[in-house]
Amino acid sequence: MSKRGRGGSSGAKFRISLGLPVGAVINCADNTGAKNLYIISVKGIKGRLNRLPAAGVGDMVMATVKKGKPELRKKVHPAVVIRQRKSYRRKDGVFLYFEDNAGVIVNNKGEMKGSAITGPVAKECADLWPRIASNAGSIA
C-alpha cells in the first residue's frame, strides 16, 4: 500500500470496523484547547451513493471544533482518530474497543498540533502515525 496517501505515516493499514460516520462528535484527546471534534469528512474515502463516509481507528478525518478555544472554532482541522467505541478485530483474533471515541488535531503531514495525549492510543493508530505514538502516554 502506498504511503503517499497518508502523509507522515508508516506501516500497513489493516481493515477495521468503521464506527464513526460523518456527523459524529468525538472527544479531543490532546492539549490544544479543543474539547470535541465534529467529523465532516474522511480522507481517502471515495464513497458510494447514499452511503455516509465513516472513519475508524488510525484514519485521518477533517473536523471542526464545536467546543473549545475560540481561535480553534469555526475552522476545519485535520485530525486522526485514536480510539473508537465500536469493536474491531485484530489479526491475532482478539476483539477490542475503547470506552470513548477520541481524536487528536494534526497538520497535513500527520504531526500533532498539541504536545500531550490523554488516555490510551490504539496500537493500529500508533503504528501508522509515529508522531502520535511518540506523544502517547499508553498504547493499547
From Swiss-Prot:
Pfam family, one: Ribosomal_L14
CDD domains per UniProt: Ribosomal_uL14
Superkingdom classification of source: Eukaryota
Molecular-function annotations in GO: large ribosomal subunit rRNA binding; RNA binding; structural constituent of ribosome; transcription coactivator binding; ubiquitin ligase inhibitor activity; ubiquitin protein ligase binding
Entries under SMART domains matching the protein: Ribosomal_L14
Localization in the cell: Cytoplasm
One of the GO BP terms on file: cytoplasmic translation
Modified residues (Phosphoserine): S17
Gene3D superfamilies: Ribosomal protein L14
Residues bearing the modification Phosphotyrosine: Y38
UniProt-listed InterPro entries: Ribosomal_uL14, Ribosomal_uL14_CS, Ribosomal_uL14_sf
Keyword Ribosomal protein: yes
Record keywords: Cytoplasm, Phosphoprotein, Ribonucleoprotein, Ribosomal protein
GO cellular component, one term: synapse
UniProt key word S-adenosyl-L-methionine: no
UniProt subunit comment: Component of the large ribosomal subunit.
Main function: Component of the large ribosomal subunit. The ribosome is a large ribonucleoprotein complex responsible for the synthesis of proteins in the cell.
HAMAP family found in the cross-reference section: Ribosomal_uL14 (MF_01367)
Family of the protein in this entry: Belongs to the universal ribosomal protein uL14 family.
NCBIfam families, alphabetized: PRK08571.1 (NF006344)
Protein name: Large ribosomal subunit protein uL14
Upper classification of the organism: Eukaryota, Metazoa, Chordata, Craniata, Vertebrata
This protein's encoding gene: RPL23
